[in-house]
Amino acid sequence: MAGHSKWHNIQHRKGAQDAKRGKIFTKLIKEIVISAKIGGGRIENNHSLKIIIDKALAVNMRRNTIENAVKRGNGDFDGNNYEKIRYEGYSLGGTAIMVDCLSDNRNRTISDIRHAFLKHGGNLGRDGSVSYLFTKQGFISFDTGNENQIMEIALDEGAQDIITNDDDSIDVITTPEDFFTIKDVLTTSGLEPSHAEVTMEPASRVELNLSDAEKFMKLIDHLEDLDETKKIYHNADISDKVMVRL
């Protein structure tokens, strides 16, 4: 199947965003600590922890920093009771947004999220107001690679779809349950993905013009800057022509 890479387009200016490395590290360390506290420090038994550690390694976090965070999670922790919360809302053009947070103060977090939406022309909705527009799935992306080899291995292991994009990148789509198996088989076969995660994929996307895209990206940037934000999902489609002008 051919297409246009959603990852290479809409994971909005990640090269620029990743310049905020210190903030990214702080968020990832908190996620590692909490995941280890909730599910234990062994990645064989804690898939959530494995995903977060893979993200940390992908941004060049040192292994001893990761190990120390896991140890903190297995120990006394810091006394705070964090909970996972998902907020849902709409932005310009009817774009749907979901924000996954780790919060130790629900009232503060919802106030911060609501303020971000209102400031940038969006509206915070109720639980379930946009989540029905998304499906949970595994996503394994390769910048380039042997398409036939990737396709053969992935399909043999039960991948749902293989997408060859206009920029020659390749995306493997899996069920959440098959994600780790397929990713591990591809990796052990010498096929190292540029990005891999279990994500929420929208059923369809809303294309934004330059004006709406500028305002939309300001909302996304604001949400990403909040300490409590863990992950953002949305169904906006910003063309390459518009993206280069942001």
From Swiss-Prot:
GO terms for molecular function: DNA binding. It comes from the Bacteria. InterPro entries: Integrase-like_N, TACO1_YebC-like_2nd/3rd_dom, TACO1_YebC_N, Transcrip_reg_TACO1-like, Transcrip_reg_TACO1-like_dom3, YebC-like. GO terms for biological process: regulation of DNA-templated transcription. Its main location: cytoplasm. Keywords: Cytoplasm, DNA-binding, Transcription, Transcription regulation. It is found in: Cytoplasm. GO terms for cellular component: cytosol. Belongs to the TACO1 family. HAMAP family: Transcrip_reg_TACO1. This is Probable transcriptional regulatory protein Rmag_0394. It comes from Ruthia magnifica subsp. Calyptogena magnifica. The lineage of its organism: Bacteria, Pseudomonadati, Pseudomonadota, Gammaproteobacteria, Candidatus Pseudothioglobaceae.
